[in-house]
């Protein structure tokens, strides 16, 4: 039996939507993208949603909307993918990486509080695996640090504190204390990449909570300008009779979503509650099967939060990195693809060049060295889930 790690769940519904988009004669940003934005905003309970070509672009556009740039500092986790950190570098701000708490995938919140200076302009928490982080703690931290905050644009002044900019790449559909992620932090970015629960092949979106004194429609238009060359009309608006004239308001960027991508998303959204439920069924089976094994797993469903069930993260108790890698190889030999989430950011060459060293992030390294991620996707049959369970137990026992 061969078990893929995370293939997309594409049905005739998605295929038909894409075909209709292709036949429509409009394949770039247009009515389907706008409809997906409306439906996502309704689903999440946010004023607006801006669909873009990736979560990375969404996060960078959020930082730019907030006016963050050279001379500013942005805090995020050392335990994540590069896309949580690289947008900070893109805008020219100083990247401040925080170690995880012991035996946790979340940042050490005491270290977050200690890292805040009068230059801190955003904190980017990461919902690893689809599990919402401790947003209440984060808001307490930024409210306690109000006296240090020096705002530099209208949005910052309206907030009056350090903005929480959530990396929700994994957590589309998750809830924190009854609220959807995307509607908890000040700003949020989501990924719709091919491996995500909800996909548009490539893609992502930005959302925000209403900020008193800030017009949501004007903010939406600012995102549109930033993501389409600074052009004050999109291609669809320019096709209207006599409406060719346009202006370039700034030398900005190109990261819009196309209607072909949005067509996939519209179909996915119709099915999404069922996809989330299937992920929970698989997680429950894994949890039950591994409860007596020498492993630690992430709690996806608690009284406080409901995960999106994106990744099934397993730590092998007391294992070395070499033993973890051996387990990955043995499972691959038996046809089960696994992965590791994540190699901490300071271990990568690009960040070493920026002066980071994994020696300064011992807890993040301890999380990484014995972590393995098992297949978790909605194409898995019950038989395949049973095979993953059997194979994992067998290979774990042989270490």
Q: Where is each model-derived feature located?
A:
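N-terminal "arm"/small-domain region of PLP-dependent enzymes with the aminotransferase-like
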Residues: 1-26, 31, 247-249, 375
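Amphipathic, non-transmembrane alpha-helical secondary structure
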Residues: 16, 60, 109-117, 136, ...
């Amino acid at each position: 039996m061969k078990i893929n790690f995370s293939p997309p769940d594409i049905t005739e519904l998605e295929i038909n939507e894409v075909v209709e988009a292709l036949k429509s004669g409009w394949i770039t940003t247009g009515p389907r993208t706008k409809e997906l934005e409306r439906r996502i905003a309704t689903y999440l309970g946010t004023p607006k949603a801006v669909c873009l070509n990736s979560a990375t672009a969404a996060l960078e556009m959020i930082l730019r909307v907030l006016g963050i740039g050279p001379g500013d500092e942005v805090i995020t986790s050392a335990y994540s993918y590069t896309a949580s950190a690289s947008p900070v570098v893109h805008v020219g701000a100083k990247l401040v990486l925080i170690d995880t708490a012991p035996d946790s995938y979340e940042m050490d919140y005491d270290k977050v509080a200690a890292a805040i200076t009068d230059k801190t302009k955003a904190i980017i928490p990461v919902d690893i695996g689809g599990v919402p982080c401790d947003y209440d703690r984060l808001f307490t931290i930024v409210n306690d640090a109000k006296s240090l905050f020096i705002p530099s644009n209208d949005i910052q002044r309206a907030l009056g504190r350090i903005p929480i900019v959530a990396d929700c790449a994994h957590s589309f559909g998750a809830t924190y204390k009854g609220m959807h992620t995307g509607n908890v932090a000040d700003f949020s970015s989501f990924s719709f990449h091919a491996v995500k629960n909800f996909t548009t092949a490539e893609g992502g979106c930005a959302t925000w909570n209403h900020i008193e004194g800030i017009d949501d429609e004007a903010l939406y238009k600012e995102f549109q300008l930033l993501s389409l060359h600074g052009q004050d009309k999109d291609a669809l608006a320019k096709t209207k009779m006599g409406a060719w004239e346009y202006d370039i308001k700034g030398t900005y960027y190109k990261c819009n979503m196309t209607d072909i991508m949005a067509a996939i998303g519209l179909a996915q959204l119709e099915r999404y509650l069922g996809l989330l439920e299937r992920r929970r069924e698989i997680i429950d089976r894994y949890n039950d099967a591994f409860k007596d094994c020498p492993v630690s797993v992430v709690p996806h469903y608690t009284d406080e939060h409901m995960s999106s069930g994106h990744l099934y993260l397993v730590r092998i108790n007391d294992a070395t990195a070499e033993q973890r890698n051996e387990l990955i190889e043995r499972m691959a030999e038996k046809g089960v693809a696994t992965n590791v989430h994540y190699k901490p950011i300071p271990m990568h060459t690009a960040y070493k060049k920026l002066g980071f060293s994994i020696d300064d992030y011992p807890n993040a390294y301890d999380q990484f060295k014995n972590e393995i991620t098992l297949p978790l996707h909605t194409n898995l049959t019950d038989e395949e889930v049973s095979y993953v369970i059997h194979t994992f137990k067998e290979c774990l026992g042989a270490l």
